[in-house]
């Protein structure tokens, strides 16, 4: 790539400049924060909200007492960490899968993998590390919720490739990003019932709207 092409790619890059990543992280850690999109937390919030909504919905008609309230808050914390970590894992997997396409597009050519800031091997190791943290969070829940959470990995694995075969990748993004609507209910109640399914369906349409 020529210097002119590099300059044009940087100018068109979707990586925000001057974010907290640039201000506070050591230079060697910045590419890893960027590949996980920690510099763009909106995606984490969009993944997190359905889970929080579902936990709140599942506990709305309960009177659990002080210990139950503490447990609900703990679920909120676990979902928060889990959303950040698994969104990062999903973005890393997406960038690994799309690295050849990203290298040819000005908007994405400056991303860590196509730019050479992170090798594919390093990205895979990072993906495994994030996934292990996600697993540690998932096993804090009941067996049904653990199985349900693990099932979401199929959607995570499929989504990057849907962009290549359908004009509606947002639908598959909605299926993936709103899985927390099912998981939140399952974490509290140990099953999935109609309110969670309705919330999940609504979340999918919400994703179609914002994406």
Regions found by a protein language model. Give the residues of each.
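Soluble N-terminal domains of membrane-associated systems
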Residues: 1-5
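Cytosolic, membrane-interface loops and tails of multi-pass inner-membrane proteins
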Residues: 7-30, 91, 95-118, 211
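Membrane interfacial helix-start motif at the N-side
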Residues: 28-43, 117
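Intramembrane alpha-helical segments
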Residues: 33-34, 111-195
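The first (N-terminal) embedded transmembrane alpha-helix
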Residues: 37-57, 178
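Hydrophobic cores of alpha-helical transmembrane segments in multi-pass inner/ER membrane proteins
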Residues: 50, 181-184, 211
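Membrane-embedded alpha-helical segments that form the functional core of polytopic membrane enzymes
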Residues: 52-97, 107, 131-138, 146-157, ...
């Amino acid at each position: 790539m020529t210097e002119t092409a590099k300059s044009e790619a940087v100018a068109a890059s979707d990586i925000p400049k001057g974010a907290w990543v640039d201000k506070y992280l050591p230079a060697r850690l910045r590419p890893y924060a960027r590949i996980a999109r920690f510099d763009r937390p909106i995606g984490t919030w969009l993944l997190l909200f359905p889970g929080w909504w579902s936990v709140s919905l599942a506990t709305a008609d309960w009177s659990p007492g002080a210990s139950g309230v503490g447990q609900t808050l703990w679920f909120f914390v676990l979902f928060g960490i889990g959303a950040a970590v698994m969104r990062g894992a999903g973005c890393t997997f997406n960038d690994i899968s799309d690295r050849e396409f990203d290298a040819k597009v000005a908007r994405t050519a400056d991303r860590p993998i196509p730019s050479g800031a992170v090798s594919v091997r390093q990205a895979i190791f990072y993906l495994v590390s994030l996934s292990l943290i996600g697993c540690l969070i998932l096993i804090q829940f009941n067996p049904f919720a653990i199985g349900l959470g693990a099932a979401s990995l199929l959607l995570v694995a499929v989504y990057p490739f849907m962009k290549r075969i359908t004009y509606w990748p947002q639908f598959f993004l909605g299926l993936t990003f709103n899985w927390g609507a099912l998981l939140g209910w399952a974490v509290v109640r140990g099953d999935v019932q109609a309110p969670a399914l309705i919330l999940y369906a609504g979340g999918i349409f919400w994703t179609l709207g914002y994406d």
